[in-house]
Amino acid sequence: DDKPYVVYGYAKIPETKTLVIDPGTRVHFHANSGLIVSENAHLQVNGDLSNTELLENEVIFEGDRLEPNYADVAGQWGAVWFLPGSNGNNIKNLTIKNATVGMLVSNNDGTPTPTIDMMNVQIYNCANVGILARTGNMTGKNVVINNCGQASLACTYGGSYDFTHCTFANFWGSQNQYCLIMSNNNINDSPTNLTNTNFKNCIFYGSTNFGIGLEKFSGTLDYKFNNCLIKFVDTYNQFATNPLYTFSDTSKYVGCIIATNTTTNIP
């Protein structure tokens, strides 16, 4: 079936069920609509590499306004929402466009197995956050996120993350956007540990001075950047004594290039 799917409201994958999305599928979400993955439910996106500019094998999630004026308008629909206990989600060759939040991840399933495993995923033009993970457990390879109103990737309330060969850009155009936010803060409870979080051969670069924003409360904030490009233009040395940004600390930053101005080390 070559026809696209149009979703009104939030479609929900029931518990213990798996939604399998075949290569080339197009899903259009109406305003205030999205996809919910229930506890013990699974999302399997089987997109594949394409041979033409038509992206014939790519899976695409976007809004239902197809006029050219809406091609890059953020916030046209809601989110792909992974509820607590959702697990074993495998996502390949998926593009998400013009959502409010591309992926919302609410807690992992409490096991060492990643809640979400992604490869060749692209997320563009989200009104708030590309991936908002709250105590998530995620892995990603060849992930690209760009142009988000708050952050491209937000790893909040701790969790565990592993990203390789990824680009977290943000050229939203105003002053308060980040490519990456990481925090172990939990507003309502004690801080939640962020453990075993790794970024390997990744880019964090955008139109604002700071590509990353890190926040540590009591508890653990365990992260490492390996061979990454990070934009961090601290013109007034406001973070000079903050240990989270000690780029010479090889327990946190190994082989990284730090873009300390806007004219050198541009990707």
Can you say where each PLM-predicted feature lies in the sequence?
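Beta-strand/loop edge motif enriched in small/polar residues
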Residues: 1-267
